[in-house]
């Protein structure tokens, strides 16, 4: 089994050093603008819930900024993870136990500044908050 459990509540912290217009070479040079992740929520077995129907709210300072449903990620978040596993396999590389794989965001980026609190709420699957100090 590729996945023992999921953590549905996650906030990806983006720190793009390059501004528009961005080309793919800019994204690669900027390490995909990845600065970190905050993971929370309760662990969920991959067969416990139909992931396509997982909805989420992204709030900044208690105001809803973005909403979405996981089916917005290629129709099902597992499809991108399966593609990645297959692509890595074609290069004799494998996903290993303990690897964290982000399946894709189903909301747009919500910008934060010093003092802001972001809260991602996935209903019964949990939530996570982060304060920027």
Show which residues each predicted segment covers:
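Catalytic-core "active-site belt" of small-molecule-metabolizing enzymes
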Residues: 1-75, 117, 127-133
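Glycine-rich loops and low-complexity Gly/Arg-rich segments
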Residues: 63-65, 82-84, 92-93, 126-128
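Conserved catalytic-core subdomain
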Residues: 102-133
């Amino acid at each position: 089994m590729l996945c023992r459990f999921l953590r549905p509540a996650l906030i990806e912290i983006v720190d793009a050093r390059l501004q528009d217009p961005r080309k793919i070479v800019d994204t690669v040079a900027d390490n995909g603008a990845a600065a970190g992740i905050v993971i929370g929520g309760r662990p969920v077995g991959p067969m416990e819930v139909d992931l396509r129907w997982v909805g989420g709210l992204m709030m900044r300072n208690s105001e809803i900024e973005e909403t979405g449903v996981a089916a917005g990620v290629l129709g099902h978040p597992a499809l991108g993870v399966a593609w990645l596993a297959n692509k890595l396999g074609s290069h004799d590389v494998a996903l290993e136990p303990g690897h964290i794989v982000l399946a894709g965001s189903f909301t747009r980026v919500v910008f934060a500044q010093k003092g802001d609190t972001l809260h991602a709420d996935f209903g019964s699957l949990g939530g996570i908050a982060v304060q920027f100090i």
